[in-house]
């Protein structure tokens, strides 16, 4: 049973799940808004908000910490220098999730996740 389990498995192995969240986070940073499944969006929210909180500091160590998760120089630079400073006075709640529609093939709920 999954009682009080800390995260969703998303039907993937741990390495696949880690790669999925990393790629979704990079896409969100590059485009500021993406559409994905509702449960992926909810997991991504936790992942990206932790990174944004670290990136708000804006120093060298923040760059290193964010890069360790994203492994993408452009996305790291954009998060630390452009996106995170906008939230300097905000304690969490950097993203918004809105349910949009149902996927035509399997009728799963889709949602958009975007920076506020």
Swiss-Prot record:
Q: Which organism is the protein's source? A: Helicobacter pylori (strain J99 / ATCC 700824)
Query: Superkingdom of the source?
Result: Bacteria
What protein family is recorded? Belongs to the bacterial ribosomal protein bL17 family.
What keywords does the record list, in alphabetical order?
Ribonucleoprotein, Ribosomal protein
The record's gene field reads rplQ
Q: Which InterPro entries match?
A: Ribosomal_bL17 (IPR000456), Ribosomal_bL17_CS (IPR047859), Ribosomal_bL17_sf (IPR036373)
Which Gene Ontology biological process is one annotated for this entry? translation
The GO cellular component terms are:
cytosolic large ribosomal subunit
Check the UniProt entry and state the signal peptide residues, or none: none
Q: Name one GO molecular function term.
A: structural constituent of ribosome
**This protein is called what?**
Large ribosomal subunit protein bL17
Assembly and partners are described as: Part of the 50S ribosomal subunit. Contacts protein L32.
């Amino acid at each position: 049973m999954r009682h009080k389990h800390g995260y969703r498995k998303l039907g993937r192995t741990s390495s696949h799940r880690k790669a999925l969240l990393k790629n979704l986070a990079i896409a969100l940073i590059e485009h500021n808004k993406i559409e994905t499944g509702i449960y992926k969006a909810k997991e991504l929210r936790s992942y990206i908000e932790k990174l944004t909180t670290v990136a708000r500091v804006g120093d060298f160590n923040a760059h290193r910490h964010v890069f360790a998760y994203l492994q993408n120089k452009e996305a790291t630079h954009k998060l630390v220098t452009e996106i995170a400073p906008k939230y300097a006075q905000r304690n969490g709640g950097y993203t918004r999730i809105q349910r949009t529609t149902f996927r035509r093939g399997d009728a799963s709920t889709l949602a958009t996740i975007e920076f506020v």
